[in-house]
């Protein structure tokens, strides 16, 4: 959960749960009632990196890490958007009350992709035309200066731009090689997962997942160049399978890594500068 305390006396001011309670309408994304994984059985979903703060709008904007169980089938869902919120999502809370303002889900995290990395607040015009686009909003006005939240939010290092006033999806494009996301619906931001990357609830069934493309070192934005800089790399791909049907209390995970294989990318290190307006690679 995310909590706020009074700095003078330590009193709890508010608390917001990163996995929806029964009073949250998004509770239904964890399957039909009676749920296989009600709130008290769910694991992980930690916002374990630093949030962005929009002081003008009074927003905390942050990412939520992977859930457990990791396989949607175990929770009684099919992994389609929106799935088992708020894992794999960017969330904006009113910092005064803890009320949810908006959310945007980037994937159903079956792979410990951890969507917790940099959210950078930028005001810029958009006219996306990246040749490797995974999706873009068809209603973008190229003459409008948008209030954005940008970054490569997860280990897969996909670059995103969202409207930070309401969480609207604007565009997404890959950086380093990944094989987990096929595309995004430009109007809704709904993801489509690559079929071969879907982790099933079948013990021992393996999937080769390529998404180890960034870690804790943060990306950066320069207003001088209007560029986002991502410290990406083409890390090894993981051969993953379900270890058990029950996440462990110690780690929260129920997936095992049986081997690693080289990424099909031509090089390991791949730092990149991306023009925020167009989504094109600068270098």
Summary of predicted features, one role per range:
Residues 52, 196, 201-205, 211-234:
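Long, low-complexity segments enriched in small/aliphatic residues
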Residues 50, 118-121, 218:
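Conserved beta-strand position repeated once per blade in WD40 beta-propeller domains
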Residues 50-55, 60, 64, 87:
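Active-site cores of enzymes that catalyze phosphoryl transfer or operate on phosphate-rich substrates
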Residues 59, 148-149, 227:
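Conserved core beta-strand positions within WD40 beta-propeller blades
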Residues 56-57, 154-155, 224-225:
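Short strand-connecting beta-turns/loops that link adjacent beta-strands
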Residues 2-41, 56, 74-115, 120-146, ...:
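Extracytoplasmic/lumenal domain signature
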């Amino acid at each position: 959960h995310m909590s706020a305390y009074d700095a003078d006396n330590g009193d709890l001011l508010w608390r917001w749960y990163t996995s929806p309670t029964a009073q949250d309408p998004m509770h239904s994304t964890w399957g039909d009632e009676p749920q296989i994984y009600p709130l008290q059985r769910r694991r992980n979903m930690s916002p374990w990196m630093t949030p962005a703060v929009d002081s003008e709008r009074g927003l905390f904007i942050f990412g939520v890490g992977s859930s457990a169980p990791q396989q949607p089938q175990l929770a009684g869902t099919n992994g389609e958007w929106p799935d088992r919120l708020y894992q794999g999502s960017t969330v904006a809370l009113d910092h005064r009350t803890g009320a949810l303002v908006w959310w945007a889900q980037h994937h159903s995290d079956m792979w410990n992709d951890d969507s917790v990395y940099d959210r950078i607040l930028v005001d810029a015009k958009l006219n996306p035309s990246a040749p490797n686009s995974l999706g873009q909003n068809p209603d973008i006005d190229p003459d409008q200066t948008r209030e954005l939240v940008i970054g490569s939010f997860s280990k897969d290092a996909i670059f995103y731009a969202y409207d930070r006033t309401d969480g609207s999806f604007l565009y997404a494009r890959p950086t380093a090689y990944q094989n987990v996301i096929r595309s995004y619906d430009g109007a809704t931001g709904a993801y489509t997962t690559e079929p071969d990357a879907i982790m099933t609830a079948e013990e021992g069934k393996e999937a080769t997942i390529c998404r180890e493309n960034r870690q804790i070192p943060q990306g950066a934005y320069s207003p001088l160049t209007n560029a986002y800089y991502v410290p990406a790399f083409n890390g090894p791909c993981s051969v993953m399978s379900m270890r058990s049907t029950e996440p462990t209390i110690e780690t929260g995970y129920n997936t095992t890594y049986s081997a690693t294989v080289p990424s099909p990318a031509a090089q390991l290190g791949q730092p990149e500068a991306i023009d925020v307006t167009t989504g094109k690679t600068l270098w």
